[in-house]
């Protein structure tokens, strides 16, 4: 899988704000996602991040993200509609299943927020978990990739010591049919996946 790693990705204002968010308490064996969106027309849907910071994130990150998408999957760039800026807290004893991202994610990104040390996102050769490659945790390090059907298997987990808090930054589309056509996959098969296991696919659409 092709991917990009960038250190010091967020500006100081956004990094300090996101690192100091007061989140609800979760148990050590669960994960919680806070959803925030910025649309290409400027509309905002927010939960835990203020509109001002979301505007700052969009203004300071979008150009770089589009450049990365143009590098990794240039045929998808024209489908962009909105950005996800989701805060994901993973309990110290929780392990998210190995998965590939939903087709509506044109570019998938994660920025490590806190603590100072934890388990990084792990990339695999396949769903079986062969050839694991952990992207080492470093505060304000960003990992980006553009999903494909066969080469974007990954997961994440707590380190058994501290909860893991990240910003998941995705470039998104609602035109899943067009993405399926570009990737050469069966749109009806994707719809069948969602129908047969809607809970998992709704959740995978939210998280990294």
Model-derived features: positions:
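Non-heme Fe(II)/2-oxoglutarate
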Residues: 1-75
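Short His-Asn-centered micro-motif
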Residues: 6-7, 100, 146-147
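Hydrophobic beta-strand residues in large extracellular and virion-surface proteins
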Residues: 18, 69, 85-87, 121, ...
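A short coil-to-beta-strand element that immediately follows conserved catalytic motifs
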Residues: 74-86
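Conserved short histidine dyad/triad with adjacent acidic residue
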Residues: 86-102
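Catalytic core of Fe(II)/2-oxoglutarate
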Residues: 93-94, 103-105, 116-208
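Substrate-binding/active-site groove segments that recognize
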Residues: 109
């Amino acid at each position: 899988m092709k991917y990009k790693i960038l250190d010091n990705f967020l500006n100081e204002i956004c990094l300090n704000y996101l690192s100091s968010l007061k989140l609800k308490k979760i148990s050590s064996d669960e994960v919680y996602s806070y959803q925030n969106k910025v649309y290409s027309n400027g509309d905002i849907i927010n939960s835990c991040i203020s509109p001002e910071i979301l505007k700052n994130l969009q203004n300071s990150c979008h150009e770089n993200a589009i450049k990365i998408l143009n590098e990794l999957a240039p045929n998808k760039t024209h489908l962009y509609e909105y950005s996800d800026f989701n805060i994901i807290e993973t309990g110290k004893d929780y392990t998210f299943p190995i998965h590939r991202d939903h087709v509506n994610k044109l570019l998938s990104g994660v920025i490590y927020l806190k603590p100072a040390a934890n388990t990084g996102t792990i990339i695999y050769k396949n769903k079986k978990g062969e050839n694991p490659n952990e992207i080492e945790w470093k505060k304000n390090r960003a990992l980006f990739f553009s999903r494909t059907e066969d080469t974007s298997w990954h997961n994440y987990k707590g380190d058994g010591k501290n909860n893991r808090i990240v910003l998941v930054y995705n470039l998104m589309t609602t035109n899943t049919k067009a993405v399926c056509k570009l990737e050469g996959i069966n749109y009806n098969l994707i719809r069948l996946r969602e129908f047969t296991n809607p809970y998992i696919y709704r959740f995978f659409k939210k998280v990294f």
